[in-house]
């Protein structure tokens, strides 16, 4: 990837893509915030993109962090007193919460015991002096990830189950669904990770959303966006009629919202900013029309007026949303919507 990835499309002066913070203090702080929020809401050849092997998991409350290209640390929390964490189901160890442990380039596993509430966690990876964060998620039969530049992005599909998975990929772009060869019947063996360069299907530089559906088995899906300074990894989310995106820090330089309509009819999406002075509708975001099977990009930089806010999206049918926010030079924060299972929709 190059410096034109992710954040460069949001603002020209910043040449660093991804969601990065310098220094261990920011990394640890972000991990703590991620855990608290989760508990509160209950062309690059494939061989050059190494992917860590993951081990099968058994039934239970288990979360998996997609493997990172850089050395990663796993941060986990729970309302209970302890969790099991590790790099495979055979190597889980009991630890008191909150817990931080090194997983390097392996997938990270978090598991709660019977009777405990759902655990939460994140993986923090370092590469080239930069730190990136990705939440740990549960395996599912499908999910969606959005990227700003598919030409420099990968899909990472993890089969953490004990049987093979077969997945289909569908990409939604600004002009509708992208149809090309090689997107159907992709087999992922048990305990394996498959890296799929998105540039094979779309070598453009406009936002797209990839829908991954497992015909057989369950998978964990992430998106890896490449840049000159390293990479950023995001985890899959689900479509919903109502989506809440985490707080946007005050005085950010850019805020760009990516919304996709996976349905078959045209939708109108309304956006509400939740601020300390009360909710308001950002200019130009009261009704965002999206054609079927397509993706739109909305610039909210001026509309948010530099306030620290959260965002609520509402539509008559399920939509997918992701927010790309850039703060001070060299910093890009990427927020995604929680899974609908954690929301009241």
Model-derived features: where do they sit?
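Edge beta-strands of extracellular beta-sandwich domains
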Residues: 115-132, 218-227, 318-329
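Surface-exposed interaction/gating patches
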Residues: 143-163, 238-280, 341
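Conserved small/polar residues in nucleotide/adenosyl-binding loops
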Residues: 335-342
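Extracytoplasmic low-complexity, Pro/Thr/Ser/Ala/Gly-rich segments
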Residues: 41-117, 252
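Intrinsically disordered, low-complexity Pro/Gly/Ser/Thr-rich segments with frequent PxxP/GP/PP motifs
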Residues: 90-99, 178-203, 281-306
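Short, aromatic- and glycine-rich surface loops/edge beta-strands on solvent-exposed regions
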Residues: 106-116, 207-214, 308-316
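Terminal targeting segments of Actinobacterial cell-envelope proteins
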Residues: 1-22
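Hydrophobic membrane-insertion alpha-helices, especially the h-region
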Residues: 25-42
């Amino acid at each position: 990837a190059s410096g034109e990835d992710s954040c460069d499309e949001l603002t020209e002066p910043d040449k660093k893509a991804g969601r990065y913070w310098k220094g261990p203090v920011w990394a640890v702080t972000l991990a703590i915030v991620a855990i608290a929020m989760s508990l509160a809401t209950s062309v690059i050849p494939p061989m050059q993109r190494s992917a860590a092997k993951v081990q099968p998991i058994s039934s239970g409350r288990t979360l998996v962090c997609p493997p990172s290209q850089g050395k990663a640390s796993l941060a986990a929390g729970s309302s209970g007193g302890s969790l099991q964490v590790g790099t495979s189901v055979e190597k889980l160890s009991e630890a008191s919460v909150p817990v931080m442990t090194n997983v390097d380039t392996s997938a990270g596993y978090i598991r709660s015991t019977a009777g405990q509430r759902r655990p939460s966690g994140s993986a923090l990876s370092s590469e080239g002096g930069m730190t990136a964060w990705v939440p740990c998620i549960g395996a599912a039969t499908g999910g969606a990830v959005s990227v700003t530049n598919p030409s420099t992005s990968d899909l990472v599909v993890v089969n953490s189950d004990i049987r093979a998975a077969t997945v289909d990929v569908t990409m939604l772009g600004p002009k509708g669904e992208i149809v090309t060869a090689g997107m159907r019947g992709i087999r992922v063996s048990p305990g394996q990770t498959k890296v799929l360069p998105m540039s094979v299907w779309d070598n453009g530089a406009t936002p797209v959303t990839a829908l991954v559906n497992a015909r057989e088995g369950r998978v964990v899906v992430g998106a890896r966006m490449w840049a000159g300074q390293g990479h950023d990894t995001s985890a899959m989310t689900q479509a919903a009629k109502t989506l809440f995106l985490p707080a946007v820090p005050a005085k950010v330089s850019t805020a760009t919202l990516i919304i996709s309509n996976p349905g078959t009819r045209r939708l109108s999406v309304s956006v509400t900013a939740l601020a300390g002075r009360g909710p308001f509708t950002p200019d130009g975001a009261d009704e965002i029309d999206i054609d079927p099977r397509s993706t739109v990009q909305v610039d909210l930089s001026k509309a948010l007026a530099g306030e620290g806010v959260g965002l609520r999206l509402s539509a008559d049918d399920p939509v997918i949303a992701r927010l790309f926010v850039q703060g001070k030079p060299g910093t890009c924060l990427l927020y995604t919507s929680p899974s609908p299972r954690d929301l009241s929709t």
